[in-house]
């Protein structure tokens, strides 16, 4: 009744295609699916429900922050899931993982620390990716 957790988005509002490469930070609300590559930080808008899906061929080189995160591909950087994190069998994370709730499938790889945060992770700020 008083639990303030958000529900994962069931629909994808934005898609970064397999042949797309982004250099810079990405901010989103709703559902974002990444099939391509992002070199920069990815963050869901704090005051709106958001879900990030990283597909099997996708790669993110940067810090990731979202309420709900599903990883099938590769993330090179710290991951902050303020609600749920699901690491699928083919996922690979190089960096520390901060989560409220986590599900790790057999075959998932994490090269970093797993840090549980039962309370909301407010105040997490992403540093801007420096060019060059």
Residue ranges, per PLM feature:
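Extended lipid/amphipathic-ligand handling interfaces
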Residues: 64
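Intrinsically disordered, low-complexity terminal regions
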Residues: 1-61, 70, 76, 83-132
């Amino acid at each position: 009744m008083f639990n303030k957790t958000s529900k994962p988005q069931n629909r994808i509002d934005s898609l970064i295609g397999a042949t797309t490469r982004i250099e810079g930070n990405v901010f989103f609300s709703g559902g974002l699916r990444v099939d391509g590559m992002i070199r920069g930080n990815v963050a869901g808008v704090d005051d709106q429900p958001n879900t990030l899906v990283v597909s099997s061929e996708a790669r993110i080189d940067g810090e990731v922050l979202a309420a709900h995160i599903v990883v099938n591909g590769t993330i090179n950087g710290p991951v902050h899931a303020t609600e749920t994190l699901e690491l699928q069998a083919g996922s690979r994370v190089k960096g520390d993982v901060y989560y409220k709730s986590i599900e790790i499938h057999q075959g998932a790889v994490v090269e970093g620390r797993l840090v549980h945060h039962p309370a909301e992770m407010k105040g997490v700020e992403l540093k801007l990716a420096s060019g060059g």
